[in-house]
Amino acid sequence: VSAPADPEDAKIVTLARTARTRGYPAPDEGAALRDDTGRTYAAASVGHRDPALATSALRGALAAAVSSGARRFEAFALVAATPALLAELAVGTPVLLATPDGTVVATDVV
């Protein structure tokens, strides 16, 4: 299992992996992010039979961060998700893509 060299990046990968296990109705995806003050936010995906009531892990983590006042981000970690939703809020921010076992498969800047 590879891990990010930066301990703070490793922390958000771990947070995303842990959040993924709390997904509903089943583990699907987890996300975590770190804002420019060092605060971290994590969320799991939440499914529902009505797609309008479902949310992705990334949306949940971003909603928690933005509703707490965060507007700038240092890094994102995604487990079983894609970085498409990051385009607006994360320009120039590193994204750590990880498999469910925590293997970081890509590091990119959106």
Mark where each language-model region is:
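C-terminal binding/interaction regions
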Residues: V1-A26, A63, S68-V110
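Conserved mixed alpha/beta catalytic, RNA-binding, or beta-rich assembly cores of soluble enzyme
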Residues: L15-S68
